[in-house]
Amino acid sequence: MTDLTSFSAAELAGLVARGESSAVEVTQAHLDRISAVDDRVHAFLHVDTEGALDAARDVDSRRAAGEPLGPLAGVPVAVKDVLTTKGVPTTAGSKILADWRPPYDSTIVRRLRAAGTVMLGKTNMDEFAMGSSTEYSAFGPTHNPWDLSRIPGGSGGGSSAALAAYETPLSIGSDTGGSIRQPGAVTGTVGVKPTYGGTSRYGLVAFSSSLDTPGPCARTVLDAALLHEVIGGHDPLDSTSIPAPVPDVVAAARLGASGDLTGVRLGVVREFAGEGAEPGVLAAFHAAVETLTKLGAEVVEVSCPHFQYALPAYYLIAPSECSSNLARFDGVRFGLRVGDDGIRSLEEVMSATREAGFGPEVKRRVMLGTYALSSGYYDAYYGQAQKVRTLISRDFTTAFEQVDALISPTTPFVAFPVGARTADPYQMYLADLFTIPSNLYGGPGISVPCGLADGLPVGLQVMAPTMADDRMYRVAAALESVVGPFTPPAL
């Protein structure tokens, strides 16, 4: 049989359902692949071999008993190490949580288990999801399977690199300012940020609570849609969860795969027309626009004048919320504890713990956020940023009165060499230039491969109105039907 790691998730689910391959065989093939290549890629922080095989055996037993199986039963999935997994390490890429094993599953993980997917393990990430390259992980960087000397994007580079390395057919990420879509773009995979509130944040280690959004990652648009359908939907344990059904993203992906976009009106954001983007990225984007036009879409230019303020607004809102959220990591209740010698005061222990446990990027953002929220500065910084956020949301609302979806490059540049930007935080922050607006608005966004620049993947971003996730899946699948899924060089 063909190497099982080369199949899509939809194909693997079909093999298992028909009894042409067992879930154990599928799982073992991916575990073997991880053993063979992950010492070079470093996509995983923890591989739960026994747990994965036990879950696979359960699927095989249920099939043998004639029980109905879900659409992804027996399919392996990797989970970004920012979602709690009962009894399995959850570090958020930080030294401060290095030995923490949560006593409960996040809602996303619970739904994955209920659907019969097989969790392979936890993937590497920038510490507390703060970064754009997965170089800020306390456990070392992840490498891009397209070129191991380059970054896989961030913060969820591990989830996307694992897909590109064929270590898993599916993975879960979280997107606060582009942390699913940007890694997807630079690894040639599909990354989806659902509508905020469309996927549960219960059990997600919080970075910026008004922005954090868990979502699916895959190698094909249909696979991402199938995973989206499994993890999405209302959750009473999350106060920000939208009490509405998941849009019919699977049907939309299948419709788009026909390659017909007749009647679809797409908007190119004028303010994103080339600012800060590499020539190769722009060339791939313009070629994708031509392809979408040939598929029947009408492409027009729209203006979103406040998008230029999205990056500075984000870097006030997100650090402000993270400075509050990360206050819980103090060495008192769980995680790392430093200096508890019976002599130091509680305040000294807390300070020593945070000094030793947090990395430089986390400290930078906590300090920035604390300042922005401090007395006398709150209105000038955090308050003003929230007003800008409202203006950006109005830009989206106005734009979506004219078009069905917006398109742009996902990132301004292709994957850069490891270490090339760590000395300049601002250059690192520019990686999310095109993705941040949809986080501030709360609407969905997807990155789908659209071409190559200098032999490296380029992603097209499709943004849609809130709870219209199906629209972006249709457009992305249509482009994929022409461009096709990308295959990196052999490792």
Swiss-Prot record:
Q: Where is the active site?
A: 80 (charge relay system), 155 (charge relay system), 179 (acyl-ester intermediate)
**Domain of life, source organism:** Bacteria
The alphabetized UniProt keywords are: ATP-binding, Ligase, Nucleotide-binding, Protein biosynthesis
Gene Ontology cellular component terms for the protein in this record? glutamyl-tRNA(Gln) amidotransferase complex
Which GO molecular function terms does the record list?
ATP binding; glutaminyl-tRNA synthase (glutamine-hydrolyzing) activity
Q: List the disulfide bonds.
A: none
One annotated GO biological process? translation
| EC numbers on record | 6.3.5.7
Swiss-Prot/TrEMBL catalytic activity: L-glutamyl-tRNA(Gln) + L-glutamine + ATP + H2O = L-glutaminyl-tRNA(Gln) + L-glutamate + ADP + phosphate + H(+)
Q: Which InterPro entries match?
A: Amidase (IPR000120), Amidase_CS (IPR020556), Amidase_dom (IPR023631), AS_sf (IPR036928), GatA (IPR004412)
Identify the Gene3D superfamilies for this entry: Amidase signature (AS) domain (3.90.1300.10)
User: Per the similarity annotation, which family is this?
Assistant: Belongs to the amidase family. GatA subfamily.
Query: What does this protein's UniProt record list under function?
Result: Allows the formation of correctly charged Gln-tRNA(Gln) through the transamidation of misacylated Glu-tRNA(Gln) in organisms which lack glutaminyl-tRNA synthetase. The reaction takes place in the presence of glutamine and ATP through an activated gamma-phospho-Glu-tRNA(Gln).
Subunit notes for this chain? Heterotrimer of A, B and C subunits.
Name it. Glutamyl-tRNA(Gln) amidotransferase subunit A
Query: Which organism encodes this protein?
Result: Salinispora tropica (strain ATCC BAA-916 / DSM 44818 / JCM 13857 / NBRC 105044 / CNB-440)
